[in-house]
Amino acid sequence: MSRLLVLKSSILGDYSQSNKLVDEFINHFDQQQIVVRDLAQQPLPVLDFQVATALRAAGELTAEQQAIVTLSDTLIDEIKAADTLVIAAPMYNFTIPTQLKNWIDLIARAGVTFTYTEQGPKGLIEGKKAVIVTTRGGIHKDAASDIITPYLKTVLGFVGITEVEFVYAEALNMGDDFANKGLASASEHLAALTA
């Protein structure tokens, strides 16, 4: 797990529990081998007509389209340079933050990070792992309300990242006792991953 790409997506900045847990985790690694991208502090463009057409354009690109493709290429290069992705994915209204979804929309590119074959889709990013730290106000793990786990497993697997470890910090809005237990459980899980 030597080279890490860290993706933070919480809008809460220094108050974010997912960011704090991720920071605690990455402190166990060589800081020279870590790239941190705070998607809330450095927002990415939303998938709209301009972005979609730029990522699918053939032939000569406009300056705006080229800027979008260059950004997408940079994000994909960050993944390729890493051994492990560490993703902070707090639950907002049962799903991931918009900021993380914007990143996904820019890295999921046909012919670049996945392709279609006669056997179905095939991810083109291989040999990578992902650790996903997901924080929730309530208790959702293994429940129908946990949309994050299957979604991120699916989208990461679609681009070829199939070794995915989830770390859950739950019940954070259910009082101090529950919150402290949820955070302690997540910290223990993360510590075990550094061993």
Swiss-Prot record:
Keywords for the protein's UniProt record, in alphabetical order: Flavoprotein, FMN, NAD, Oxidoreductase
Cofactor, free-text remark: Binds 1 FMN per subunit.
The EC number(s) this enzyme carries: 1.6.5.-, 1.7.1.17
Pfam families assigned: Flavodoxin_2 (PF02525)
The keyword Flavoprotein appears for this protein: yes
Keyword Oxidoreductase among record annotations: yes
GO MF: electron transfer activity; FMN binding; oxidoreductase activity, acting on NAD(P)H as acceptor; oxidoreductase activity, acting on NAD(P)H, quinone or similar compound as acceptor
Catalytic activity: 2 a quinone + NADH + H(+) = 2 a 1,4-benzosemiquinone + NAD(+); N,N-dimethyl-1,4-phenylenediamine + anthranilate + 2 NAD(+) = 2-(4-dimethylaminophenyl)diazenylbenzoate + 2 NADH + 2 H(+)
Required co-factors: FMN
Binding site for FMN: 10, 16-18, 91-94, 135-138
Subunit structure comment from the entry: Homodimer.
Described function: Quinone reductase that provides resistance to thiol-specific stress caused by electrophilic quinones. Also exhibits azoreductase activity. Catalyzes the reductive cleavage of the azo bond in aromatic azo compounds to the corresponding amines.
Similarity comment text for this entry: Belongs to the azoreductase type 1 family.
Protein name: FMN-dependent NADH:quinone oxidoreductase
The organism of origin for this protein: Vibrio vulnificus (strain YJ016)
Lineage of source species: Bacteria, Pseudomonadati, Pseudomonadota, Gammaproteobacteria, Vibrionales
